[in-house]
């Protein structure tokens, strides 16, 4: 039967058994047979002769289109089989034995049906009914054919093959295996017995040479049909081969093979046999054929130092790779288009350097008329030093993509005097998909770095995992996945059970699930590596990195990144973020779980979000945060160090080193700008939560304090004031001449801090040591209060010179002396309160610099609440009058629950002087009791709109009777107030002075 008989368009081929007649069968060829059993038990097969396709609707052919020549037509029934039996026609396997004997060229009656338990001799041949194969051997037959029996292949009869000779040809190879051959040259039979030709295998050598165009024709017989038969080898290799198996639109049959699998090569998948070479061969074949690999199950044991290179799509999801203990190899994924390196003497680099390269440029102007690098990712190195990394000076570098004639995707952070190397990586025209296998480290392989991606672009990498990894990796490659020279990459869904604690030479070293170098536009999505270990990600010389929905214990950058670093919707562990940057960092909707009990309080650096201390602790860019959550507390660290961790930390291991070389354009900020929009701390803390919100350890003077720090909508959930410690920061570049700031009004602001809609008990600002006090701080608190178990006002302490402004806040206390160190400000500052409330248990102000006279607290449109009194002179009454300069304020007494004018002095005058200190510009109201009896006349004073002191004070008064105004003299230490008003002389005695 020809294979074409199986075509769906052929109705005269082999019958296909589709079982019992039933509803819902889809008929697309008349070869499909359905069997119907009538009420008498007769089983009849029916073939559909109507229009195709057809779907049955009932269980009976008579009601599903009917039985006719144009509908259902019967072909064979049980009665017909019984008739054949009566005629002596046997339809069992035995009936086929003579035919099979002829086909296999076996002796007549030597072939029998395989029957378990039967003894076999060398002259016996057995037909196995299970699959129709023929076997021969000596022994007892089992339930299925097996050793020592061997399968016998049939012998075909005659095949003809032709070819056209070339000039001088005397040899040709017939593309078949055969036993007998007849050779014809130009139609003449050649005589083998007289030396006309010699046969060696499938090669025929002629006795003499042919001329070009001579006709070669052979007739061969007794061709064995093997597992890989001649149709696959020859017929299906022809351009029209696919048509021979019914694929009318196909070409070469090889085109139909669009992937390779391990199963195709019968590779052991139990993990018990070393299959290193077999897998490597499949990788090589896939690279050669440029087709993907797909395998979704099995465990495969590998060993040795083999590097498995693959440059096509590769889907090994579900596969487990089991490296042996001596395994030092790795899977290397790379693209066909490899990079080109242009050195300083190349014409391309010379062309780039022909134009000036400036900071903020997004065009290499030297390439404005050159297309060499179009559509390439480039990695450039320059002549100028940028920074020092662990004692090594690193020169200028930049990663970007050239779209067309020098146009870069990324602007240059810094300019450079000249380029000395360009590595150009062609960007792939297609997206390559990689699905990683699982790696089982149960054997503790000698190398952990089992996955590497080198020189790749537009790769989408999925899945994969590492498990049974020891917590302590001793003297091993500490990186699982390494990515080098890459552009436009997404790595997602990789699962590492936990990061390890690495030990090298007995000391803690680094260990990472993922490491990358020289990359641009790489995204890590849904990666898991969370636990007690060292780290998850270590990167250097990288540009534009994104972490999305990752559950990892640390994000770590070694060399500073450029462009952006985005951490979005992630869950980070105890180590948080450690990064040096020459770009901006964005952290959004991310949690930090800082519980440290398992680590016994050990931290590499103090902060949750840190700069790299081994690179000098600088970060020449901003950090922008939105909606982050701090979970738990570093309680062991707090116990050992008697302080909490910091939120932001810029710290250098060695303050004596110069981490920024002379002439470098890098500015050593400890974060240039910090903007936090949304911070929530879930665990209540007794005391202050952070040692400092922004911190530089010790007095290092290596990095600048951020120019701008802003906290919006933050809840610190602690019971003591939070702190910003200014110790240890380098002298601000805005006062590089070290001008002594004696008065905040006499110098521009150098640094800006702002809190809006924040909840904390209070805030403390600790100034640098006096010899480094060159900052002029501008700090604003807007709508801040403490929202804990109840709403309460906040306290503010500072010894740092600055302009401090509080708008719509609830304030308890303001002091120019720090709470934690009792350090008094040594410079003049200013304090302004706009709106809001001042609600104090005791006095609200303690301004001690220069006795407070030169540092007024300007209070506008504010409500004062507290133990204010109009009937007695209280300390809070006097404190507000002395330190605050008031405008449109009101006083509410929580003693009698009413608005009042606080009393500053009550009583009667005497010859003794009474001293009252009132801030210049405050309004006071003096009440005078009339001592002269004049009918219809009472005496009152107007508000005295200036400060009160012992001595003469000018003012005015009026009498109710006439409204006449006159001048008077007031002596607060005199007995009477006297004045001449027209013709009436009035006398009065001061009985009270009140703050308005």
UniProtKB/Swiss-Prot annotation:
Its main location: virion. Keywords: Degradation of host capsule during virus entry, Degradation of host cell envelope components during virus entry, Host-virus interaction, Viral attachment to host adhesion receptor, Viral attachment to host cell, Virion, Virus entry into host cell. It comes from the Viruses. One of its GO terms (biological process) is symbiont entry into host cell via disruption of host cell glycocalyx. The keyword rRNA-binding does not apply. GO terms for cellular component: virion component. Gene3D superfamilies: 2.10.10.80. It is found in: Virion. Functions as a receptor binding protein (RBP) and probably mediates the attachment to the host capsular exopolysaccharides. Displays a depolymerase activity that specifically degrades the K64-type polysaccharides of Klebsiella pneumoniae capsule. This is Depolymerase, capsule K64-specific. It comes from Klebsiella phage K64-1 (Bacteriophage K64-1). The gene is S2-5.
């Amino acid at each position: 039967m020809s294979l074409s008989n199986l075509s769906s368009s052929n109705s005269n081929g082999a019958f296909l058994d589709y079982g019992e007649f039933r509803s819902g069968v889809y008929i697309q060829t008349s070869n499909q047979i359905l069997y119907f059993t009538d009420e008498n038990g007769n089983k009849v097969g029916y073939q559909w002769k109507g229009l195709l396709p057809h779907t049955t609707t009932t269980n009976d052919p008579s009601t599903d289109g009917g039985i006719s020549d144009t509908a259902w037509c019967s072909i064979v029934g049980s009665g017909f089989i019984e008739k054949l039996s009566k005629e002596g026609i046997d339809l069992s396997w035995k009936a086929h034995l003579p035919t099979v004997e002829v086909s296999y060229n076996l002796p007549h009656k030597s072939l029998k049906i395989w029957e378990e338990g039967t003894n076999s001799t060398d002259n016996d041949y057995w037909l196995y009914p299970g699959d129709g194969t023929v076997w021969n051997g000596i022994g007892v037959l089992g339930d299925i054919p097996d050793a020592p029996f061997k399968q016998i292949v049939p012998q075909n009869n005659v095949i003809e093959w032709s070819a056209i000779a070339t000039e001088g040809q005397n040899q040709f190879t017939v593309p078949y295996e055969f036993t007998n051959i007849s050779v014809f040259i130009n139609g003449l039979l050649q005589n083998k017995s007289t030396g006309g030709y010699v046969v060696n295998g499938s090669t025929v050598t002629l006795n003499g040479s042919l001329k070009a165009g001579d006709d070669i024709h052979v007739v061969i017989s007794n061709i064995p049909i093997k597992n890989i038969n001649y149709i696959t080898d020859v017929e299906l290799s022809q351009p029209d081969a696919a048509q021979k198996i019914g694929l009318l639109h196909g070409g070469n049959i090889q085109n139909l093979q669009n992937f390779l699998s391990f199963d195709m090569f019968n590779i052991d998948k139990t993990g018990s046999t070393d299959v290193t070479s077999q897998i490597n061969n499949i990788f090589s074949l896939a690279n050669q054929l440029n087709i993907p690999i797909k395998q979704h199950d099995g465990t495969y044991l590998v060993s040795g130092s083999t590097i498995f290179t693959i440059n096509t799509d590769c889907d090994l999801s579900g596969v487990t790779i089991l490296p042996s203990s001596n395994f030092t190899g790795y899977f290397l994924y790379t693209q066909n288009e490899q990079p080109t390196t242009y050195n300083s003497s190349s014409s391309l680099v010379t062309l780039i350097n022909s134009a000036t390269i400036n900071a903020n440029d997004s065009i290499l102007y030297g390439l404005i008329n050159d297309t060499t690098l179009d559509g390439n990712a480039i990695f450039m190195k320059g002549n100028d030093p940028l920074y020092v990394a662990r004692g090594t000076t690193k020169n200028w570098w930049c990663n970007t993509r050239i779209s067309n004639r020098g146009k870069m995707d990324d602007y240059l952070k810094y300019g450079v005097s000249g380029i000395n190397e360009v590595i150009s990586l062609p960007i792939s025209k297609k997206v390559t998909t990689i699905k990683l296998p699982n790696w089982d480290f149960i054997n503790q392989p000698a190398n952990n770095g089992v996955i590497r991606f080198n020189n790749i672009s537009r790769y989408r990498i999925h899945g994969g995992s590492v498990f049974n990894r020891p917590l302590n990796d001793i003297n091993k490659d500490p990186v699982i996945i390494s990515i080098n020279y890459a552009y436009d990459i997404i790595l997602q869904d990789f699962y590492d059970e936990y990061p390890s604690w690495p030990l090298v030479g007995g000391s803690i070293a680094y260990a990472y699930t993922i490491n990358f170098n020289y990359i641009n536009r790489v995204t890590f999505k849904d990666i898991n590596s969370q636990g007690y270990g060292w780290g998850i990600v270590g990167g250097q010389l990288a540009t534009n990195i994104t972490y999305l929905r990752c559950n990892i214990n640390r994000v770590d950058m070694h060399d500073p990144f450029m462009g952006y670093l985005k951490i979005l919707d992630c869950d980070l562990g105890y180590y948080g973020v450690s990064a040096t940057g020459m770009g901006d960092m964005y952290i959004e909707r991310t949690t930090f779980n800082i519980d440290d009990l398992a680590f016994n309080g050990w931290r590499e650096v103090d902060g949750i979000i840190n700069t790299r201390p081994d690179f000098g602790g600088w970060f020449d860019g901003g950090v922008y945060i939105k909606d982050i959550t701090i979970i738990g507390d570093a309680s062991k660290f707090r116990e050992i160090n008697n302080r909490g961790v910091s939120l932001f930390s810029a710290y250098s291991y060695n303050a004596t080193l110069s981490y920024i070389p002379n002439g470098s354009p890098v500015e050593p900020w400890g974060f240039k700008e910090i903007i936090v929009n949304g911070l929530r701390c879930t665990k209540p803390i007794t005391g202050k939560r952070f040692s400092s919100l922004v911190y530089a350890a010790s007095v290092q003077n290596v990095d600048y304090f951020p120019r701008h720090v802003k906290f919006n909508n933050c809840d610190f959930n602690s019971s003591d004031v939070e702190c910003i410690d200014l110790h240890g920061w380098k002298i601000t570049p805005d006062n590089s001449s070290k001008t002594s700031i004696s008065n905040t009004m006499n110098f521009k602001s150098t640094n800006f801090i702002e809190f809006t809609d924040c909840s904390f008990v209070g805030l403390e600002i600790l100034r640098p040591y006096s010899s480094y006090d060159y900052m002029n701080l501008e700090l604003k608190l807007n709508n801040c209060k403490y929202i804990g178990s109840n709403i309460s006002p906040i306290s503010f302490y500072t010894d740092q010179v600055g302009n401090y402004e509080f708008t719509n806040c609830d304030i308890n206390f303001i002091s120019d002396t720090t709470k934690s160190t009792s350090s008094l400000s040594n410079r003049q500052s200013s304090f302004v309160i706009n709106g809001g409330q001042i609600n104090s248990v005791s006095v609200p102000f303690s301004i001690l610099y220069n006795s407070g006279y030169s540092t007024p607290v300007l209070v506008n449109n504010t409500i004062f609440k507290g133990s204010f009194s109009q009937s007695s002179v209280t300390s809070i009454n006097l404190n507000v009058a002395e330190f605050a300069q008031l405008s449109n304020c009101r006083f509410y007494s929580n003693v009698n629950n009413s608005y009042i004018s606080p009393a500053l002095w009550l009583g009667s005058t005497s010859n003794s002087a009474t001293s009252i200190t009132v801030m210049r510009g405050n309004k006071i109201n003096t009440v005078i009791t009339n001592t002269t009896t004049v009918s219809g006349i009472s005496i009152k004073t107007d508000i005295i709109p200036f400060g009160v002191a012992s001595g003469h004070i000018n003012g005015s008064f009026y009498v109710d009777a006439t409204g006449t105004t006159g001048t008077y003299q007031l002596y607060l230490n005199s007995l009477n107030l006297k004045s001449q008003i027209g013709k009436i002389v009035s006398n009065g005695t001061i009985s009270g002075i009140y703050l308005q």
